[in-house]
């Protein structure tokens, strides 16, 4: 059994893999619009961004919902034969990705691999007219992933 010692602490100043904050939790669901409606009306989350057929996304719909410092992403596939569709059919609605804000995506990616993590997406930058985002992903438990942002 794993035992954690109270005196065994990672020194923040020396650990290059320090997580600064949680960025988001992404749920893969059967109906993103319905899930967004629920989170807005039942739990008080506000929609802050979306991607769907209306924005040119022909693979899936996603809604970013925010309340205070909490940010969730609700995504649903248009096709059951896609990766997202197959995952949703197998597992039902649930968490797919946990986004972690780190100081340096490249360093966090490399250090996680050095510590035994399985890399999925190497450091990648995406951008559009609204800005850019650098991220990398690693495999964790089951089919859930962690995304360094």
Give the residues covered by each predicted segment:
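Conserved oxyanion/phosphate-binding beta-strand-loop segments in alpha/beta enzyme cores
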Residues: 1-10, 63-81, 145-149
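Core segments of cupin and vicinal oxygen chelate
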Residues: 3-7, 17-71, 114, 123-129, ...
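Vicinal oxygen chelate
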Residues: 20-30, 63-64, 83-110, 115, ...
